[in-house]
Design a protein with these regions (language model features):
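Extracytoplasmic/secretory soluble proteins
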Residues: 203-206, 225
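Glycine-rich loop at the start of a catalytic domain that most often binds anionic cofactors/ligands
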Residues: 207-213
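Hydrophobic alpha-helical hairpins/lids featuring a short glycine-rich hinge
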Residues: 174-177, 185
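Active-site nucleotide/adenylate-binding loops and adjacent lid/helix of ATP-dependent enzymes
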Residues: 60-61, 189, 213-287
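Structured, non-catalytic alpha/beta "coupling" segments that mediate domain-domain communication
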Residues: 183-203
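Long, compositionally biased, glycine/small-hydrophobic-enriched stretches that function as flexible linkers
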Residues: 11-164, 171-173
C-alpha cells in the first residue's frame, strides 16, 4: 500500500513539501564518525522529490547558484572547486542538497563546518542527512532552515536568507562558551581530549569514562563548588536529574507572557509558578 499523501502547500507545485521525521544532535563518538563528535542527524522524507532530482526541477540550478554563490567552494565527491555545482547540474537528490545548504549557512554565520554525509534508508524517499556543527542550537536551526531554503528554491518563491543567518549568529552568541571556558576546551581539543557540554552554560565534561573530569567556567570538579551551584538552580538541577532518567515534574523557565502561554501548553494545569532562585516557598503561586 502506498503512503497517504497530504494536499500540497503550493498548489502550482507538483512535489509535496518535505518532512523532517527526526532531528537530533550527536555529542560524542557515534555511528557516523568516531573522530567527529559534533554532528546533526536529520531523518528526512523528501516525498515525491525522490522522482525529481535537481536536473528535473526547472530553474533550480540557476536559483541556488544565485542565492548561495559561495557554495562554489564545495568540492563534494568531485574533488575540485565547483564540484557540488557539477553534481547539481547533472542531477542529485534533495537530501544531498540540504546537507550542503546546512553546512554553508553555518559558514556564512561565522561557524566553519565541513563534514557532511547523506545516506538513503530502507524506506523509499527517506534519507539520513548528517552534517557537523559548532554550536548545537545553531546546528539544529540550520537543519530546519536548510529544508525551508531548499523548498523555496524548488518552488521558486522568495526567501529571506539573511534573516536566518542573523538568527544563527544570535543563537551562537547566546550559547557559545565564555572566553575562559573556551580557552580550556580549545587546549583540551588540541591535546586530543574529547569534550561534552552538559548544559547551556559553562558546565563541561572533559574525557570519557573513568578518566572524565568536569569544569564549570574555570572551577574544577575537585571541589564541591560545582555541586553547590547546581543545587541552588532549580532548572539546572531538574535537567540534570532528568538526564539520568530520574522522574521530575514537567517545567519550563519563563521570561515573557508569550513564553508563559507556550509553557502552559506543555506543563498543563494545575501548575506552580515560582522564582527560579527562590526558596522556602517565597514568591510561589499555585493554581
Amino acid at each position: 500500500l502506498g503512503r497517504t499523501r497530504r494536499p500540497p502547500i503550493f498548489p502550482t507545485e507538483q512535489a509535496y513539501p518535505m518532512r523532517i521525521l527526526e532531528l537530533k544532535a550527536m555529542r560524542g563518538p557515534n555511528s557516523w564518525s568516531v573522530r567527529r563528535h559534533h554532528l546533526i542527524v536529520m531523518r528526512l522524507d523528501i516525498e515525491d522529490l525522490e522522482q525529481r532530482p535537481t536536473d528535473k526541477i526547472p530553474g533550480f540550478y540557476e536559483r541556488i547558484t544565485t542565492m548561495l554563490p559561495t557554495m562554489v567552494s564545495h568540492r563534494c565527491s568531485e574533488d575540485h572547486e565547483g564540484g557540488f555545482w557539477s553534481r547539481v547540474k547533472r542531477g542529485t537528490w534533495m537530501g544531498h542538497v540540504i546537507e550542503h545548504i546546512a553546512l554553508e549557512i553555518q559558514t556564512l554565520a561565522g561557524m566553519e563546518t565541513g563534514f557532511g554525509r547523506t545516506r538513503s534508508t530502507r524506506e523509499k524517499g527517506v534519507y539520513n542527512v548528517v552534517f557537523s556543527y559548532v554550536e548545537e542550537p545553531v546546528g539544529l536551526f540550520a537543519a530546519k532552515s536548510a529544508v525551508r531554503i531548499a523548498q523555496a528554491l524548488i518552488d521558486g518563491t522568495p526567501y529571506d536568507l539573511e534573516a536566518d543567518i542573523q538568527q544563527m549568529r544570535e543563537l551562537r552568541e547566546e550559547s557559545r562558551l565564555g572566553p575562559s571556558t573556551a580557552s580550556i576546551v580549545h587546549e583540551a581539543v588540541g591535546r586530543g581530549i574529547p569534550y561534552l557540554r552538559l548544559n547551556g552554560q559553562s558546565l563541561v565534561q572533559l574525557g570519557h569514562g573513568v578518566h572524565q573530569k568536569r569544569i564549570r567556567a574555570t572551577i574544577t570538579s575537585k571541589t564541591s563548588n560545582i555541586g553547590v551551584e547546581i543545587a541552588c538552580d532549580k532548572e539546572e538541577t531538574k535537567q540534570l536529574l532528568e538526564s539520568y532518567e530520574i522522574p521530575v515534574p514537567k517545567g519550563r523557565v519563563v521570561r515573557t507572557e508569550e513564553g508563559l502561554k507556550d509553557a502552559l501548553t506543555v506543563v498543563g494545569y494545575p501548575c506552580v509558578i515560582k522564582p527560579i532562585g527562590g526558596n522556602h516557598g517565597r514568591g510561589a503561586t499555585i493554581g
